[in-house]
A protein has these predicted regions:
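Gly/Thr-rich phosphate-binding beta-strand-loop-beta motif of the actin/hexokinase/Hsp70
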Residues: 2-21, 100
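Nucleic-acid-processing active sites and adjacent nucleic-acid-binding tracks
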Residues: 21-46
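Phosphate-backbone recognition surface of nucleic-acid-processing proteins
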Residues: 32, 209, 215, 220-296
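Short glycine-rich phosphate-binding loop at a beta-alpha junction
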Residues: 45-55
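Short alpha-helix plus adjacent loop in nuclease-associated cores
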Residues: 71-111, 251-259
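A short, charged helix-loop
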Residues: 101-123, 161-170
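Glycine-rich, often acidic, oxyanion-interacting loops/wings at catalytic, nucleic-acid
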Residues: 125-206
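Acidic, carboxylate-rich catalytic segments that either coordinate divalent cations
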Residues: 281-318
Length: 318
């Protein structure tokens, strides 16, 4: 089987390191840098980008708009392959880009193609998360102010319109200013949620049939798994739910998997908490595991694994 020609790309905040056919060059993460990289690379080549949905997201979108085929390269694969291509285990931008190019060119390796729709969806989700964090920070400051003054506020949830209007009427200018910020952030978050819903594909909408999965959570799950092909066990491992063997000598056991997709893991964990409290099936399963002698933490892990199986059936079987 003929090898495909791949440009290996190691992306950073300010630079992109590219390697192909023994040539290596670094470019800036600007439009001019992207144009130079495309001109420098051989014609009709494919692009394998480490972090295509993170630091490499803008570059990936640019390449796709120019008609190039772009694939996502897993950072863990780079780490493993580095030991093969470098005797000393050298860690550099040159070595990483070279490894990505070499491994991606292997005909037996299958990579996930990056799509503009998924890039846009991930952009919106990331933006919303950023604004939600900012809103949480403002609310925490407001609550801390009330605690220091020994005042019991009229509202506990400062994300509601009534609570914000109440803040805007306060005599303290700092509280009024916080109310204005919260009002603006709420508008931005609501607008982003509408845009995310419009971008939601039909397959992601089917995930909302599972108790505890909202449209936003469904989009997050879909965006994290778009284009990937995996078994139930692989999906559980990818989401960080499946435990990792931790054995040494007579010691036998497992530990938590911290190498999975953390955003996906967070969503599944939140849904498992919701189901253990409000869903009859999830609650019964959770109680059953507790009766078997498992700890609350272990029982919730079991519930998360059951959720993984349900999500996998919708995403990869339907």
């Amino acid at each position: 089987m003929k090898e495909k020609l791949f440009v290996g790309v190691d992306c950073h905040k300010n630079t992109i390191a590219c390697f192909v056919e023994g040539k290596f060059k670094e470019f800036s993460t600007t439009k001019k840098g992207f144009e130079q990289a495309l001109k420098w690379a051989p014609k009709d080549c494919n692009w394998a980008i480490e972090g295509a949905y993170h630091f490499g997201l803008t570059f990936a979108a640019y390449l796709i708009s120019k008609g190039c085929k772009v694939y996502e390269f897993n950072a863990l694969s780079t780490s493993k392959a580095r030991k093969i291509y470098s005797v000393s285990g050298e860690k550099s931008d040159y070595m990483d880009a070279k490894v990505i190019s070499k491994v991606a060119s292997d005909p037996e390796i299958r990579l996930q193609e990056v799509s503009l729709a998924t890039i846009e969806l991930k952009r919106k989700i990331s933006k919303r998360e950023l604004y939600v964090k900012q809103r949480t920070g403002v609310i925490n400051n407001v609550k801390a102010g009330f605690v220091q003054e020994g005042i019991n506020p009229l509202y506990k949830d400062f994300t509601t319109k009534r609570a914000i209007q109440w803040l805007l009427k306060q005599e303290d200018s700092e509280k009024r200013y916080a109310g204005k910020i919260l009002e603006t952030l709420n508008e931005i978050i609501s607008q982003l949620e509408k845009e995310i819903e419009e971008l939601t594909p039909e397959k992601a909408k089917r995930l909302t049939k599972i108790k505890g999965i909202s449209t936003l959570r469904a989009c997050t799950i879909y965006a994290s798994t778009r284009g990937k092909k995996m078994s139930k066990a692989q999906f559980a491992s990818y989401s960080g739910v499946a435990p990792v063997r931790n054995e040494s000598g007579l010691k036998q056991g497992h530990r938590n998997n911290h190498r999975g997709d953390r955003r996906l893991n967070s969503v599944i964990y939140s849904v498992s908490i919701c189901q253990s409290k409000y869903d009859p099936i999830g609650s019964n399963y959770y109680l059953k595991k507790l009766q078997e002698g498992k700890t609350k933490r272990h029982a919730r892990k079991c519930l998360s694994r059951m959720l993984c199986n349900q999500i996998w059936k919708i995403l990869f079987m339907d």
